[in-house]
Amino acid sequence: MDTSFRDGFQSVYGARVLTPDFLPALDASVEAGITHFEAGGGARFQSLFFYCNESAFDMMDTFRAKVGPDANLQTLARGINVVALSQQPRDIIDLHAKMFKKHGMTTIRNFDALNDIRNLQYSAERITAHGLKHEVVITIMDLPPGCEGAHTPEFYLERLQLLLDKEVPFDSICFKDSSGTANPRKVYATIKGARKILPADTHIRIHTHDTVGCGVAQYLAAIEAGVDGIDLAKNPVSGGTSQPDFISMWHALKGTDYTLDFDFEKILTATEVFEECMKDYFVPPEARQVTALIAVSPMPGGALTANTMMMRDIKTLHLLPKVIKELPEVVRLGGFGTSVTPVSQFYFQQAYANVALGRWKKITPDYGDMVLGYFGQTPVRPDPEIVKLAEKQRKKAIYHGDPLDLLEPGIPAATRKLEEHGLPSTEENIFIIASCEGKGLDFLLGQSKVNVRKQSATSQLN
């Protein structure tokens, strides 16, 4: 799958890319014969409303029109969060699937950062009910040194078996490593084990980021173990915090029994067009470099650049090295959730607070709620002392139930909000309000501003 136009944008530009700017590159990619694209979801849903003053639904419609009716257009969803950072109730989860089907998407890749199967069950049912293909995800990574108890091949295969036992409907499965830290031997053992558990015709994919510099090695291990598909991106959004490059992977497979199904010369041409399209966009230095420290301080490529952009905005980028070094501590004590949105943000926020305010002086709201169980069950129990701190500061008890049971229906509240502001209560508008809240309302009221980072002051839009 070509991830250039979703995860590539998210990992390199913090998802802030205007649709007209990349369309020539999309045309060139279609001409190159690519038929499977990541087209939206993840941070590329909210970011279009937040920073581009565009509708993500309009972007998806345009994407489909460009690639034709037969291409597989895939988006990313976060289980019960769907494409929001906050948890969404059942009616909004259903509406997510309905709207993404309506606006031309084919497949939804769907993950839960805690690998809590409960958080995947309902969304899986609604995705398939609306005629979309469901690519269920098990999130993977390597733990920081000294952490034991989860994130082993055995743990992932136990999660996979539970998916099967609970009869979660899916069409394919992806092992998703957003921090790029799962070591290649672990990748091999996990894919090899999954092949033994799953029916022979099950399509298995792997997704990674090249932040640590191991992306190609991970893919080679997965291919050796029997994986069916990998995710690649094209320059200028390949490597570093994004996915390995088409050409790099093509080169790595020379002399093996495997090849990639694309025309080399046409991919080169598409890459040149893409580079021209994106030449004015500001590329944070950390987005295109290998950051070896991430191997022991897991931070997803898609979150690293978003966080550094935020730190640039508030003039605290000088704290980044200390925050990265603090990450192992918050992972170790927080229950070993996978470092992928939204848990990666919980980790980063807590690490930032530990650096800025003093270690564990303040439990951030989301990290606190996570260790208390409000986002689901963590892979291992969080540290008891951290749980006590969270109970005290959040003034909440430990929760063992299903997070969905805590949420009131979202459609009535969103409808009231639209009516209060004289806006039409279309299903699209309802979903925008539910998933984007105040910034979604600003967009619908015509009050949003474009905030896309480009190279020169004259081309930067604010």
What is each PLM-predicted segment?
Residues 92, 151-158, 212-227:
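Catalytic cores of alpha/beta
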Residues 110-113, 177, 225-242:
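Glycine-rich phosphate-binding active-site loops on the catalytic face of alpha/beta enzymes
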Residues 60-68, 121-131, 188-199, 250, ...:
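Surface-exposed amphipathic alpha-helices with a cationic face
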Residues 24, 28-48, 286-462:
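Terminal or standalone catalytic/regulatory effector modules within metabolic enzymes
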Residues 1-7, 13, 35-39, 71-78, ...:
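Hydrophobic faces of well-ordered beta-strands that scaffold small-molecule active sites
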Residues 8, 110, 173, 226, ...:
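Conserved, mostly hydrophobic/aromatic
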Residues 41-161, 177-180:
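Active-site beta->alpha loop and helix N-cap motifs at the rims of alpha/beta catalytic domains
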Residues 238-260:
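C-terminal helical cap(s) of enzyme catalytic domains, especially alpha/beta-barrels
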